[in-house]
Amino acid sequence: MTDSMKFGPEWLRNMSAEPSGSPSTYNVGNAAQNNSIGGHNLGNNTAASASRNLFPEYRYGREEMLSLFDRNCLLPQILPSFKKLFVEKVQCPLALTPSSEEDINQNSLGNNSRPAWLQRSPSGFGSASRGSGRGGTVDRGRMRGKSAYHPIYQRPSGLYDESLSVISKAERTWSDRNGTGDSAATTTSTSGSGALDWNGTPSSSPRKDYSNNHRNLENWRRTRNEDGSGDGPSSSGSMSGPDIAGWRSGVVGGSTNAGFGTNSHRWGRSTSWRDEDPSVDNAASLQRSISTVATLSTDRTGNNKGSGIGAAEGVGSISHPRLSSSKISQLWTVNNAAGVDADENLPEWAIENPSKLGGSFDASGAFHGDTDLKPIKSSHNTLKTKSLDSYDDVKRPKSKDLSDPDSGNDITPETSLTKDTNTTAVQEEVESSLSPISSTTTKEVIHGDISDRIKEVADEVEKLIMDDDHKISSNQSQHQNHDGFTAALPRMADIEINVKPSVTAVHRQAPSTMPIQITPTITDVAPPSHAVVSFSDHETMQHHNMHHLPQFPMIPTPHIITPNLNELWFYRDPQANVQGPFSAVEMTEWYRAGYFNENLFVRRYSDNRFRPLGELIKFCHGNMPFTHSHLLPSPIELENIPVGQIPAPLTASLSITPHKPSPIPIALSVVEQQLQQQRDEQLKANVTATAEALRAAIKGSFGGNSIGNTSHLLTMRFQMLQDQYIQHQEYQILAELSKNECFQRLSAVEQETVVRRKVQLLGLPEYLISLNGLSNSLSVLNPVAGRQLYRAVVEHAKKDQQHIFANTEQQRSVGNLLDANNFILNAQIMIQQSQQEVGPLVSSVDCIMQGGTAADLNKPNEIPRNELDLINEYNLRMLLRGQPTSTQQQPPALTNSATENLPGVDFLTETQLLERQNLMIPIWLPPNNNKQQETDQQWAEMSNADASLWETANLNEERNEDQQLLIQKSSEACFADTEKDVKIAQLFQVQSGNVVNHTALEELDQSPQNLKGSHNQKIVKSLVSDIQQNHNEELNSHQHQVKQANKQNLNTKQNAAQSALKPINNENDRKREQTEEKKRQREERKRQQLEDDKRRALNESEEQTRQIQEEKERQQQIQAQRRKALLGNVHSLSVQNGMSGTLASAQSKKNDDAKTAEPQVSSRLPSTSVAPWSFQLQNSMRSAPGLAEIQKAERRERRADQQRHQELLDKQLRANAAAAAEANDALLKWQSTPASAPVMSLAEIQAEEARRLANDLVDRQRRRELEHHQQAPLSSAVLVTSATSNIWGNANKAWSSSAAQSLSLKTSSGTGLWDEPNPLGSNGSGTSGTSSVTAAAVLAGGLNSANKSTLQAQNKSSALFASPRNLRKSQTLPALSNPEKSNKNGPGQRPEKQKLAQTRSKGAAVSIEEKDRERKLNAKSQQSSTDQAISKVNEYENEFTSWCIKSLDNMSAKVDVPTFVAFLQDLEAPYEVKDYVRIYLGDGKDSLDFAKQFLERRSKYKSLQRAQKAHNDDMCKPAPAITPSANDYADSKNKQKKIKKNKMTKMDARILGFSVTAAEGRINVGIRDYVEGP
C-alpha cells in the first residue's frame, strides 16, 4: 500500500546504511523528517538508524512535518559518513526562516523597482507569487524548492512581476549541484528559457513537478518502470501514452487509453490519483486534470506569451493553455481520465496549495481533503459540477462563448439559479460547452479554459475561503429566489459577445511583457454579487473576490475601445515640461502606483488646454478619466467650460469607491440597484460619521485648543481619520485571519506583514482619499451634514483669518494644505449659495482667504520659508496656465455680486483662490497698465464733485499721511539694504502711483554714495532726468486740477458779488448772505493758512535738502580725504605710482563734483511750483535723516576706520618683515653681498691681472733659472712653500668664490662650496685665464706686498688647475714650472713640456737667453689657444647660468638663486638634484622640467669643462684613484686614441690607470721634504 510513497529525490531514497545498498532498496524510513517534503534536506533525522530500511507506516502533511521539526535535535552519526551528501550547516525549514533583505532583493524586477507600499499586488489570501524564492540561493547548500504552498510563507508579489520572462538570477540545475541525473534529463532541463529549479519551475515549490511550464525529467519523480528503478525520459516531445510510461502511468504495452491511475499497488485504497475507468478518455476529465495542476501564482499565469502547442492525444490534440511556444513539457495529465475521486486522493505534497485543504493523512495512509465535504459529486465519467459555486456557474458558459459565440444564444445560463434546475441538464450544458475545446487551438479557447480550470482549482484547494463563498453564494441564491427574479442578470453569452471585439484591441495595447488574458472575472462583471451584511463584511468579501484576480494581469480592460486620439494623454511635469503622449493604460498604472496626484495637469490628445486631474475626475463623477474618457465632455464642450468649473452633481447616486477599473458598462438590474442602494446607505453612514468627526474636532478647537489654522486642523484631523480607518481595517482583517490555523502559527511579525499587505490591497474609499473627495461624497450622500460641516469650517476660518500660515511648518505635506484650503473655499461657497447672501459673504470670503493686509505683503522677507515655497509653486502654476487674473484690476473687497468673479461656478479657479489668499508676488502679476487711468479718473471725480480746494487738500493730506506712515515703517525696517528699498518701492507702486517717484528720488539721493565711475554717473543722471520728467508731468496734471478748482472758486465769488448788488428782499436773503460771507471768510482764512503752510513747507523742505546736501558733501569730503591719503601713500612709494595717484585723485574729484551735482538736481526738483498737497509727502521724503540713515553712516565710518587701521597694520607688518629679512641677511654673511665699493669693471680687472701675472711669471722663471744654476736645493724649498700656500689659498678662495660670484647674478658661475673657482666665470672678454675669484680677492684689499706675491702664486696655480672633482683619474701631472700651459685645447702642449723637461735635465747646456725666448714664445701660443677655449666655455657658462636664473625667476622660487644653482652644481647624483628641486621648488610640472633640463645642461657644461681641464693636476689634492669610473675610462679612452694619433708617442702612460712619472714638484704621501742647506 505504501511502497509508492517515495518522498524526496532518488539519491536520498537510495541512501542506505548498508555497505551494499542497491538502488531498488528504498531507504526512506522516517527520513521524511529528514527532508522537508520534496527535497528540502534539513540535515537532522529524528528516527533511529535501525528503522531506516522500513517503509513508512504513516504519512504526514506539510504542517504536521513543520510541527514535528525540532531545532535541538542532534545529527545522526551516520549522516556525516556520506561526504557528498552531508551538509554541515543545518538548514531549517524555509517556512520557519524569516525573510532577509537579500531574499527580498532576489524577487523579480517589478517588485524591486518600487517600494512595498506602492505595490498594488493583486494577490489574494491564497496567492503564491514569490518571484525567485529564498530556497533558490546557492549559498543555502543544495538548491531547495520555493515555498509556494501557502501565502503565509511567501513574499508578496506585485503587479509587475515577470519571474518567467525575466529570470532574475541564474540557478544551477539539480544535476550540477548534486551530481545526479542523466544526460537526457539535463538536456531536457536546459531546453527551456535558462537555468531552472530542480523540477523545472523557477518560482515554484519542488512539489510542483507537474506544473504548467518549464517541466523536465530531471526531478526525483522521473519516469520509472513498475519496480521503481526508473525507465528514463521520453524520447520525443510527444505526449502520447507510451512515451509517458512511468510509475504513475500504468502503461505497460503502450496503451494510449490507459490513465495514470491503473497501478493499484501504488496508492492503497485508490488505484491512482485519478481513480476512474481507464477506458474512458473524455475532454472534460482532461481539462479537469490540466486545471488541477494549474497554479495560482502570478509568476506563471502572468507571463504566458504565445499560444499553446497542441499535444498529441489518442484521437486528436488539445491546446494547452500554459505551454510556452519555446518549450514542450511532458504532461502527466494528458492521458488521464479523471473520475469521481479525482480530487480526493491527490496527495498533499503533490498539490499546489495543500494548506488550503486543511486535510491530512489518516492512519491507513489515505489522504482526506476538502472534497470529502463536497455536497455534490458527479458520477463515473462526468465532470463534477458545483452548483453552489457562483464563479464556475459564470465561467463555464463564458468559456463556451469564447470558443463558439454563435452557440451562446441557445444556452440558458446557470446564473438564473432557479430551484427546478436539473443537475443533469447542467452537466450536459457544461459538456457541450467544453466539447469544442478538444478540437480547436484558438486563443479564445485558451483564455476560457484557463479561467475555468483555475477557478475550479481555486475552489477545490482553498477550503476556508470557499466556505465563505458557498455561504455568500447560497445567500445570494436565496435572495434572488425569494424575490422571484429569475434570469434577471444579463446573459453572460451576450457579455462575452461584447467582449470579443475588444480582444484584438487589447492584444495591440498590452505590452510585450504582459500576457494577453481578456477573460473578465466575476468580480469584473458583477461586483455587487455578494449580499451586503455589514461594511466590514463587504470589505472582507471584496478582498476575497480579489483573491481570484492574480490569475490575470492588471490590464485595465473595462473601457476597451480601439485606440484613438482620446486614448492618448499628455501631462505637464513640475518642471513645466510636457510629457507624452501616453496611453490610458500607462497613465492608469502610474496613477495607481502613486506617481500622480490630483494636482497633475493633464489633457487628451484632442484637447487644447491642460486641466488638473482632480477636475477631470469630478467630470467623470469620481471615476478615473483615463479609463472612462467616454464620460468626459467632448473637446469642444470642454473648451467652453472654464477651468475649475464642473457640471452640477448628478441627482442619481454615484459610486464613491477608490479608483479602480470599473466593470464593463451594462444595464443594472433591479436586484443590483437594491444592492447599490444598500451599499450607498452604508457608505452614507460612514461619510456622515466622518463629517461629524471633523465638525466635532473643529468645534472643539473653539474652546482654546485651536491649532491656529483651519487648514492645518482639517489636515491633521483628516489624516487621523485615515489612520483610524486603516487601523479599523487591520483589526477586521486580523479577526478574519485569526480563524485560520495556519495564520495562528505565524509569528507576530509575519502576522503583521500579512495583515498590512491585505490592507494595502483595500485602499481608502474616496471620502477618505482627500477632503475634496469628502466634499463630493457629502454633496451626493448627505448634503445636510455637508452644510453643517461647511458652517463650522467657515466659522473657524473667520476666527483665525489673521493666522493662515502660522503653522505651515507643522503640516505634513503641501498637497494636504492645498487640499484643505480648497475645501475651506468650497465650504464658504457652499454656505454662500445656501444662504443666498452674496455680498457680505463674498467680502468675508475675500477677507478670510486674503489672510493678511497689504502691509503684510510689504514684508516678503518675513514670510516663512514654507510659505515662500507655496507662493512659488502657485506662481509657477499660474504662469504655466497662461491665464492669470490680476488682483490690481479688482478692488480689494468684492462689493458686487458673486457672479462678478464666480460666473455660475461651484468652485473657484486657482487664480481667484490666489487672489483671496494674497499669495501671488507682484512680479508674477501682469503690469498695472491702468494705474495712471485710475489716478486720472480719481482726480476727475474729485474735480467734478462740488468740493472746495481745502477739502481736496485735506483728502490728499490724509492720504499722504497714511502713505507716509507706511513708508516710514517700511524704510526703518528695511533701510539697511538698498535692494529691499527697491522691493518696497515696487510694492508701494501697486497701491499708489505717486509714491514711486518720491521713493525713487530718495533712493537716488543715496545711490551716488554707492555708484562709482563715469558710466554709472551717466546712468544715474538719465534716471534722474526721467524721474524728474515724470514728476513734472504729474505736477502739471496736479496744477491743472488746481486751476480748475480755482476757476470754480472764482466763479462762486463772482456769483456772490453779483448777488450782493441785488436788493435784499427779505431777511432770509440777508441771513443767507451773511452765512455765505462768513463761509467765504473762513475759506479765505483757510486759504491763507494753506499758503502759509505751503511757504513753511517750502522753507522746511529747502532747509532739509540743504542739510542733507551738506551732510553728503561732508561725507564726500571725508571720503576724498581718505582717498587722497591712500593715494599719497602710494605716491610715496614711487614716482610712477604717484602719477597714477594724482590721476586717481583728479578722477575722484570729478566724481565728487558729479555726485554733488546730482543731489542739487534732485534738491531743485521740489522747489518748482507744485500743488500744495504734494509737499506733505515731499517733506516726509526730505525729512531729517532718520535713525536708520544715521546708523548706516556710522557703519560706513566704522568700516572706513577699520580699513585705515588694517592698512596701518599691513604697513607695519611689511616693515617688520623687511627688518627681519635684513637681520637674517646680516646673520648669513656668507651669502650676503659685500658692501658696495668703487670697483673696476671685470674686463679691466682681468686685463690688469693678466698683465701682472705674465710679468710675474716671466720674472719668476728668470729668477728660478738663475737660482737653479746657482743652488739646486733652493728650488725645492721654493716648491715646498708654493705648495703649502696653494693648499690654504685654494680653501680661502673657495670660500670667497661664492661671495665674489654673487656680485653679479647674470655672470655667476655657480661654483660649489669646496670646488675650485671656475676660470671661465663671468669672463666676457676672455682675454686671460684668471678667474673672477682673483678679482674678488684683489678687490678685498688690505694685502701687503708679500701677501700679493703669495696670492699671485696661488692664482697662477688655481686658475690653471682643475678642481679635484673634474680631474681625471688617469691624467698625468704636468710640470709645475709651466702650469699655465695645461689647458683643455692644447694638443701641442706635450712637445712644449717635453722640451722644457729636456732643458731642465740638461741644466746649463742651454743658455738662459734661449730659454727666456722659448718661454715667451710658449706663453704667447698658450695665451692664444687658452683665450679661444676660455671664450667658448665662457659663452656656454654664461648661457647656462642665465638660463638657471631665468627659470627660477619664472617659477617664483623662494630660494637664493645663485646659491641654489651653485649647490645643485655640486651634486653628482642626478636623483639628488631632483630630490632637492622637489624639496625646494615643489612637485609641479615646472620643477620637474627644470630638474631635467638642468641635468642636461650641466652635463654639457661639465663635458666642456672637463675637456678644457683634461690635463690639469692639482698639487693641493691627493692623487686620483687607481681605478677610474666607467664614464671617465670611456672618455679617457677616446681622448687617448685621439692624442696617440696626434702625438705619435711610443706609449700613453694613462692606459695603466696611474701616473708613471710624477711631477717634479710632487710630494707623495709619507715622503718628507728635506731642504738642503747652502
Swiss-Prot record:
Transmembrane segments: none annotated. One of its GO terms (biological process) is neuron cellular homeostasis. GO terms for molecular function: mRNA regulatory element binding translation repressor activity. One of its GO terms (cellular component) is cytosol. The modification Phosphoserine is found at residues 272, 291, 399, 403, 407, 1007, 1370. InterPro entries: GRB10-interact_GYF, GYF, GYF-like_dom_sf. Disruption phenotype: Larvae and adults display defects in starvation-induced, developmental and physiological autophagy, which result in the accumulation of autophagosomes, autolysosomes, and increased Atg8a expression. Adults display reduced locomotion and decreased life span, likely due to the dysregulation of autophagy which results in the accumulation of ubiquitinated proteins and dysfunctional mitochondria in neuronal and muscle tissues. TORC1 signaling is also inhibited, possibly to compensate for the loss of autophagy. The modification Phosphothreonine is found at residue 412. CDD domains: GYF, UDM1_RNF168_RNF169-like. Residues 566-614 form the GYF domain. It comes from the Eukaryota. Signal peptide: none annotated. Residues 206-227, 388-403, 1067-1115, 1408-1417 have a biased composition (Basic and acidic residues). Residues 100-150, 174-324, 388-443, 1036-1121, 1142-1169, 1307-1329, 1359-1430, 1507-1540 are annotated as: Disordered. A motif (me31B binding motif) lies at residues 341-369. Residues 1-640 are annotated as: Important for promoting translational repression. Changing residue 571 to A: In GYF; impairs interaction with Patr-1 but has no effect on translational repression or induction of mRNA decay, and does not affect interaction with me31B or Not1. Residues 120-131, 180-195, 232-243 have a biased composition (Low complexity). Changing residue 349 to A: Abolishes interaction with me31B. Residues 105-114, 254-271, 282-304, 409-443, 1038-1058, 1159-1169, 1419-1430 have a biased composition (Polar residues). Keywords: Phosphoprotein. Belongs to the GIGYF family. Component of the 4EHP-GYF2 complex, composed of at least eIF4EHP and Gyf. Interacts (via N-terminus) with eIF4EHP; interaction is required for eIF4EHP-mediated translational repression and mRNA decay. Interacts (via me31B binding motif) with the decapping activator DDX6/ME31B (via RecA-like domain 2), and also interacts (via GYF domain) with the decapping effector protein Patr-1. Also interacts with other decapping effector proteins, such as Edc3 and Ge-1. Key component of the 4EHP-GYF2 complex, a multiprotein complex that acts as a repressor of translation initiation. In the 4EHP-GYF2 complex, promotes translational repression and decay of mRNA targets by recruiting and bridging the association of the 4EHP complex with decapping effector proteins, such as me31B and Patr-1, and the deadenylation CCR4-NOT complex. Involved in regulating starvation-induced, developmental and physiological autophagy, which is critical for eliminating ubiquitinated proteins and dysfunctional organelles in order to maintain tissue homeostasis. This is GIGYF family protein Gyf. It comes from Drosophila melanogaster. The gene is Gyf.
